[in-house]
Amino acid sequence: MPKARVFLAWSGPRSKAVATALRKWLPHVIQTIEPWMSENDIEKGARWLTEISGQLQNVKMGIICLTPENLLEPWINFEAGALSKINDSIVCTYLHGLETTDVSDPLAQFHGTKADKEDTKRLIHTLNSRLEGESLETTRLDEAFEKWWKDLETDLSNAKGTHAQEPPKR
């Protein structure tokens, strides 16, 4: 059975670090999930817009990595909107350095997940419940989460120091 793909949306250095951390971590916790991230999963020479559009049409789960720096980025809103138009899809905003009250519409319409242990665990349970016959039993899922949480927590902590660089002056 093919793995369930999860689209990881990001924009900016800190958001990219969060998405990268999730891409590495998710398959350890739920082995039947295959995260997809543009930075890593588009081959050199491929048409990136075509690749992203194809992924957005064929996934049922997406995680939008939000940070204070990218809340108003058009691409984040585009990807969230594209994911939300798919029948039976879920769009999970993952808030790094943000509170749910920091997020405005249209992204506020999605029930946000804070990048902390308790809320991330709830997100994992949501993703697992969407795996249609491939989900892990709750005890096994909780054990895997506890085993791998420290790795994600470390990577999320390291992402806090990642900020956008000033654009070069002409």
What are these regions (language model features)?
Residues 41, 68-69, 94-100:
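Short beta-alpha junction loops
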Residues 2, 68-86:
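Conserved TIR/SEFIR loop-to-helix hotspot centered on a Trp-containing motif
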Residues 1-62, 84-89, 170:
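Conserved N-terminal substructure of TIR/SEFIR domains
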Residues 28, 81-91, 96, 102-103:
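Arginine/glycine-rich "motif VI" loop of SF2 helicases in the C-terminal RecA-like domain
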Residues 35, 90-92, 112-114:
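Conserved beta-strand scaffold positions in the cores of enzyme catalytic domains, especially
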Residues 44, 73, 78-80, 105, ...:
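Generic structural "secondary-structure junction" signal
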Residues 1-27, 97-170:
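C-terminal interaction surface of TIR/SEFIR-family domains
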Residues 62-63, 112:
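Short, well-ordered beta-strand core segments
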